[in-house]
Amino acid sequence: WLAPLKAFREDISPLVAIREYIRLKLEVSRDHPQASKLFCLEMLQGAPLLMGELTGDLKALVDEKSAIVSGWIDRGKLAPVDPQHLIFMIWATTQHYADFATQVEAVTGA
């Protein structure tokens, strides 16, 4: 689940980078919905098994990618936004379809 964020790069435009990140996140959620749901349950329980990963590798990766977003903002390539919260919003949107598949199916009839 970290692979899509690792692919997020500064050497391409913000539009292309964010679009590609969203595409990759949607693919992971679509192709591995059970893993996404399991991760969601782990978070709801306070991350008893993954706290070290969250405060270690994940935090470092989010800090690294947030710096990329800040650089785009500083160079006028992206509207001002809190970089961490942008990443959180992308996570929320892309994982929603897997984590809440029952709700999505009930509402859309699909």
Regions found by a protein language model. Give the residues of each.
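Amphipathic alpha-helical packing segments from all-alpha helical-bundle domains
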Residues: W1-L2, V16, E27, D31, ...
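Hydrophobic alpha-helical connector segments
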Residues: A3-K37, P83-I90
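A ubiquitous short alpha-helical element
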Residues: A7-R9, R23-K25, L50-G56, A110
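Short, low-complexity, polar/charged sequence segments that are solvent-exposed and flexible
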Residues: E10-D11, D57-A60, D99, T108-G109
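Hydrophobic/aromatic-rich alpha-helical bundle segments in the mid-to-C-terminal region
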Residues: S36-L38, M51-G52, S70-A110
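Short helix-capping/turn signature of helix-turn-helix
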Residues: L41-G46
